[in-house]
Structures are given as C-alpha cells and as structure tokens.
Amino acid sequence: LVVLATTVVSFRSNRASDGRKIAVNKRRRELVVPPGKLRECCGRVGPMCPKCMCPPRRC
C-alpha cells in the first residue's frame, strides 16, 4: 500500500511537470519569429516594431 501511494504521487508530479514543459515550449515557439517578420525601427529590431516615430534625421 505504501509503495502504491508513492507511485500515484510521483505520477501526479510528473504530469504537472509535463504541463509546465508544454507551456514553456509553447512560449518559446511564440518568441521565435521568422526573419521576414522582423522590422528595424530607430536602431531596434523586433517582431512588433511600430512605424518609426523618430525625427527624420534618425530614421
């Protein structure tokens, strides 16, 4: 009985860690942006860069 209870607890913790791994991998995929979607704006490069709002001499 004691071994069975320990096994059940370990399965639950493994499932929880799997859920965390899936969430981390999902976030990682969101952070990876194809090169064509990156824009340079005022010296910064990013996926969600708005239109450049700097003075014309800086852009």
Swiss-Prot record:
GO molecular function term, any single one: ion channel regulator activity
Keyword Disulfide bond belongs to the record: yes
UniProt modification remark: Contains 3 disulfide bonds. They are not indicated here, since framework IV presents two different connectivities (I-V, II-III, IV-VI and I-III, II-V, IV-VI).
UniProt entry keywords in alphabetical sequence: Disulfide bond, Ion channel impairing toxin, Neurotoxin, Secreted, Signal, Toxin
Tissues with expression: Expressed by the venom duct.
Signal sequence, start to end: 1-10
GO cellular component terms given for this protein: extracellular region
Classification via Pfam families: Toxin_8
Propeptide: 11-37
UniProt subcellular location: Secreted
UniProt record similarity statement: Belongs to the conotoxin A superfamily.
Domain notes: The cysteine framework is IV (CC-C-C-C-C).
Protein name: Conotoxin Bu26
